[in-house]
Amino acid sequence: MKQEEEKSVGLPDNAFRPLKPGEQYHPIMSPNKKYPEVNLWSVLWGIAMAVLFSAAAAYLGLKVGQVFEAAIPIAIIAVGVSGAAKRKNALGENVIIQSIGACSGVIVAGAIFTLPALYILQDKYPEMTVNFFQMFVSSLLGGILGILFLIPFRKYFVSDKHGEYPFPEATASTQVLVSGEKGGSQAKPLLFAGLIGGLYDFIVATFGWWNENFTTRVCGWGEMVAEKAKLVMKINTGAAVLGLGYIVGLKYAAIICAGSLVVWLVIVPGMALLFGDQVLNAWNPALTQTISEMSPEVIFKEYAKSIGIGGIAMAGVIGIVRSWGIIKSAVGLAAKEMGGKKVEANVIRTQKDLSMKVIAFGSIFTILLILLFFFFDVMHGNVLHSIVAILLVAGIAFLFTTVAANAIAIVGTNPVSGMTLMTLILASVVMVAVGLKGATGMVAALVMGGVVCTALSMAGGFITDLKIGYWLSLIHISEP
């Protein structure tokens, strides 16, 4: 029997396809056996990975506006360290390391897209007060809310729709973790790639053999085209951006590139062609130049960027509309569980799950904590503003949770920036309507956006962890 188990290291044939009527999925780790999962080894390594990759994700996110998904490289490292330590039955431990470590990217994504704006605005409005407590609590409570809101949708995405969603990142991470059962050699390519990337950036930064940001302005004809036709091309040659494109994948890297080309080759020169002799300052009275007098970079900053933000926000609305059927189906499943009979005490290991009553209580308790946070620290004791804010945050976070999970399940990337921008727009409009304006209003909108952004980012990352646990047969309630 042992020999059969050793030979069958690998995912079953029906792991990535819909199950036939009456067919069951049998994971690698037997549901009737116990395996080492949450212990000192896995938790400490998971925390170490979270610290390391939080710094990397924050650097890339603040620099290029994209946060890479850390699950795959962390899975590779987990396999490598467990192999080096010659740990037996390390698959469950490696999943926990990957799950804890991957939280780094999702929390960072929730913070860097909104909270740095507080410091940017503080430079313009010195009366604004920004403190670490606001950023910490908004990220903490937002992350908890995202997990609690996602759990009712777990069965729908993970088991009921088995084989219908590709889960690209979860698939890659699972394959890496499974390969670790045969040896820890998967970590070698990651270390080798890190050395190459570090050497590449060292040469650029230290010796300056070429500029990290290449632009067509470096040559005479490029400068002339930029001034006359408002056409300019730029490319970042850094190793970090190159690696990010590899992780995102050719398809979505091409989509991002196409969006940039449309902005710089169509929108920017198009505005100069259509409105060249006009001063468009309806939303920024400080502008006094005509469009033709501006450089392409200024046109991009003042106009094209806003058009792109509007497009991203609209994509978030479309995501909710498309996910409405999923919301109804998943809520229906959760309602059935809440109204159903009590679950048997002796259930197999992988069927242990938190009851919907616990989830409902936890969600209400977390929402109350966020309400208190808004009341005492953000809204300065205003009851109306606090109630309106929590209704907005809870409603938007719940609706967008399915959008985040659906995006991760299909394409492996979370459109959290677009959903956050939509939140900021709605929060700003509604809070102004109820009388919250000025510096306090801006801080409130950004903190609300931070809570929602972290919740959505955590929901997207958590659905990946749950799918990996389903494929490999981990206990759902043990995942962080």
Write out the residue ranges for each language-model feature.
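Hydrophobic core segments of alpha-helical transmembrane domains in multi-pass membrane transport
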Residues: 46-57, 75-82, 113, 139-151, ...
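Flexible hinge motifs at transmembrane-helix junctions and intramembrane kinks/re-entrant loops
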Residues: 62-70, 151-152, 207-211, 246-258, ...
